[in-house]
Amino acid sequence: MFKVLLEPDLQEALIFLNESVNALLTIYSECEILYSGRAKSRASLSPRLTIIKPDGSVIIHGPTKREPVNWQPPGSRIEYSIESGVLTVNAERKRPKERLSILHHRVYYITSSEVKPGEFFLVGREKDEVDFIINNPDVIEGGFKPIHREYRTPYGTVDLIGKDKEGNLVVLEFKRAKASLQAVSQLYRYIMYFKEIGENARGILVAPGISENALNLLKRLELEYVNISDKLGDSTISRPINYVPNLQRD
């Protein structure tokens, strides 16, 4: 559920804010920002976006950059008032004692929204892909058995090694983005290392895509490629990871 108040006068804006308890609020306005606490600062009058969250967080954004112009953390006490013809939002902390005052001279709009927390999954990292393959080895091929992750070699750390159904060593290099020539070369160095120490090794590059040049080099070097996006959706990578007995890790 959400509400929008367009170009209100300051009294209308004050009533709207006071009625929007436990809502996520955004205010687009011409405002000044005053801060006092461990230091003091002032941001001059300018159009800015203020975000007020139900947990007491306050964030004020300008026209550029990811970082806010100023902010207060969760737990701040929020108060609204009209003082000297200006709509004032005060966000105050007791420990440490800090006060952030946002002086809204003209309000262009205010929104009030009900926002509820949902589950959060970070997907797409190489670690997520390795975890998934450990628990779903047939995604690589039938009979594949993972035996060691983050295996150290003189040429770098191999993401995952295992055995195929014929007992051959399988070296897996994971990439979370489209694989390049560099990824193929890295995998080839690993394979050459294992062959030098007497292993009959296969190399498989696991990635959501691969460049044409990288694929051509891969074939010439007799390496293999598994497109992980064809095997599973992004949401699948975020499923819970189970313990795999006897899996070694450096």
From Swiss-Prot:
Q: Name one Pfam family in it.
A: NucS_N
**Carries keyword Methyltransferase?**
no
GO cellular component terms given for this protein: cytoplasm
CDD domains with a match to the protein in the record: NucS-like (cd22341)
The answer to whether UniProt assigns keyword Transmembrane to this entry is: no
This enzyme's EC code(s)? 3.1.-.-
Q: Name one GO molecular function term.
A: DNA binding
Keyword set, alphabetical order: Cytoplasm, DNA-binding, Endonuclease, Hydrolase, Nuclease
Q: Where is it located?
A: Cytoplasm
Family indicated by similarity: Belongs to the NucS endonuclease family.
Q: What PANTHER family has UniProt attached to this entry? A: ENDONUCLEASE NUCS
- What's this protein's function? Cleaves both 3' and 5' ssDNA extremities of branched DNA structures.
Protein name (record): Endonuclease NucS
Q: Which organism is it from?
A: Sulfolobus acidocaldarius (strain ATCC 33909 / DSM 639 / JCM 8929 / NBRC 15157 / NCIMB 11770)
| Gene behind this protein | nucS
